[in-house]
From Swiss-Prot:
Record bears the keyword Iron: no
Name of the protein in question: Tol-Pal system protein TolB
Name of encoding gene: tolB
Signal found in the keyword field: yes
Keywords, in A-Z order: Cell cycle, Cell division, Periplasm, Signal
InterPro entries per UniProt: 6-blade_b-propeller_TolB-like, PD40, Tol-Pal_TolB, TolB_N
Family classification: Belongs to the TolB family.
Gene3D superfamilies in UniProt: TolB, C-terminal domain, TolB, N-terminal domain
Predominant location: periplasm
Function summary: Part of the Tol-Pal system, which plays a role in outer membrane invagination during cell division and is important for maintaining outer membrane integrity.
Single GO biological process annotation from the record: cell division
Disulfide feature: none
Places the protein is found: Periplasm
Organism: Shewanella pealeana (strain ATCC 700345 / ANG-SQ1)
């Protein structure tokens, strides 16, 4: 519960925004292989209409994770229950699910509500002996007091708990995504946006008549680094998403691009061409001191930090075509990582540092691929068109990326094993350059 205060502060900062999904999530593959789970609609214990149904958020989260497949409500043997005391294990003997989520919502005075939920081990319930206590069936049980405006955010919190308890992996439902929306024909067509991972609570950080690109989150989730051409040249900025305060980090002649925060949040790795060819540099955010990392006549670009902060993944053409390399900051030692396919570029690193995710070109097709750094096994994850800009969820289970669908730039998502796929179409404009936030 130590993160609850931080979560409540974050939700209060965005709860005044309209509840609207700017990005839909359309699941296209992977439902059949998901693990079955039952989510009983939470019981309303007040008079009048319920503000909103938190369990709907939980069901959607679990389905979108690609890991779980919530059962249809009409197929559930019990509905209208919210506690273990009301749970009838005998009624659930034939239900194909591994767990049951149930809960209640009760007015608590003013605009406050007491929300309770329980996570029941259905497999254990179906196998239980006479000597087993019903309390042994409870995997987790919690309650908290929130406002109506916090219902959706707390639904994500419940989903995080359920996901972690059943998989051992931290849930990433209380995260956000930054992206660029382009509406051609408007006076200021470029918008830097952030939204909850599921497209709700969209917020515009910046609008410009000139291109915006390459947003990247700070490790604390408080700021974004990005490239802006608002002054008719490429410049790198860092902007606090809550105070809106902006700081210009680099504004050299030529390329100022591909900013990405170091794991400690104190530096940016960037691509600059101030000394000739595009090269990778590290900039101290506080002092603006610059250290050159690469020095080669070929193009070096698109840096990404390994979790230990001691090395970078970069795209380099020093071998004749774009490939991914690892460069160590202290020694300058550089080694090539990718060899399969015509091109490999735009790399990201999994949170555990064991895999890289990147754009792979084979036979002229650009798709998202993953490579295990120990075995060097590469797997192409997607079959969409003109894929670009992969960004990994902070728990390492999903990748969000840009692609083209029906002639329009959209976002899409794929699980790290390639089994689950989803498309995230926007209502208006083209969407590109996604960046998944850290845990918030």
């Amino acid at each position: 519960m130590k993160n609850l205060g931080k979560w409540l502060l974050t939700s209060l900062l965005i709860c005044s925004m309209p509840v609207k999904a700017a990005l839909d999530i359309i699941i296209t593959e992977g439902v059949d292989a998901a693990r079955p789970i039952a989510v009983i609609p939470f019981v309303w214990q007040g008079t009048g209409p319920m503000p909103s149904q938190i369990s709907d958020v939980v069901m959607s989260d679990l389905a979108r994770s690609g890991t779980f497949s919530p059962a249809d409500e009409l197929s559930l043997p019990q509905r209208g229950i919210s506690t273990l005391a009301q749970f009838n294990a005998s009624a659930w003997m034939a239900q194909p699910a591994e767990a049951v989520v149930m809960g209640s919502i009760k007015p608590y005075g003013g605009d406050k509500y007491l929300v309770s939920f329980e996570l029941i081990d259905l497999v254990k319930a179906q196998l239980q002996s006479d000597s087993m206590s019903t309390k042994d069936l409870v995997i987790d049980s919690r309650e908290t007091v929130i406002s109506a405006a916090q219902f959706r955010q707390y639904g994500h919190r419940i989903s995080d708990v359920v996901y972690e308890k059943l998989t051992g992996i931290r849930g990433a439902f209380l995260t956000r995504v930054a992206y660029v929306v382009v509406n051609h024909g408007e006076k200021s067509p470029y918008k830097l946006m952030i939204a909850d991972y599921d497209g709700y609570n969209e917020q515009m950080l910046l609008r410009s008549p000139e291109p915006l690109m390459s947003p990247s989150w700070s490790p604390d989730g408080q700021s974004l680094a990005y490239v802006s051409f608002e002054n008719r040249k490429a410049e790198v900025f860092v902007q606090n998403i809550y105070t809106q305060q902006r700081t210009k980090i680099t504004s050299f002649d030529g390329i100022n691009g591909a900013p990405v925060f170091s794991p400690d949040g104190k530096k940016l790795a960037v691509t600059l061409s101030k000394d000739g060819q595009p090269e990778v540099y590290v900039v101290d955010i506080a002092t603006k001191a610059i250290k050159r990392v690469t020095n080669h006549y070929a193009i070096d670009t698109e840096p990404s930090w390994f979790p230990d902060g001691k090395s970078l993944l970069i795209t380099s053409e020093r071998g004749g075509r774009p490939q991914l390399y690892r460069v160590f900051l202290d020694s300058g030692k550089i080694s090539r990582l990718t060899f399969e396919g015509e091109w490999n570029l735009g790399g990201s690193i999994s949170p555990d540092g064991r895999s890289i995710i990147f754009v792979n070109r084979i036979n002229g097709k650009f798709n998202i691929a993953r490579m295990d750094l120990e075995t060097r096994f590469m797997q192409v994850l997607t079959s969409t068109r003109l894929d670009e800009s992969p960004s990994v969820a902070p728990n390492g289970t999903m990748v969000i990326y840009g692609t083209t669908y029906q002639g329009k730039q959209v976002l899409a998502a794929v699980s790290m094993d390639g089994r689950f796929k989803a498309r995230l179409p926007a209502g208006q404009g083209e969407v590109k350059s996604p960046s998944w936030s850290p845990f918030l």
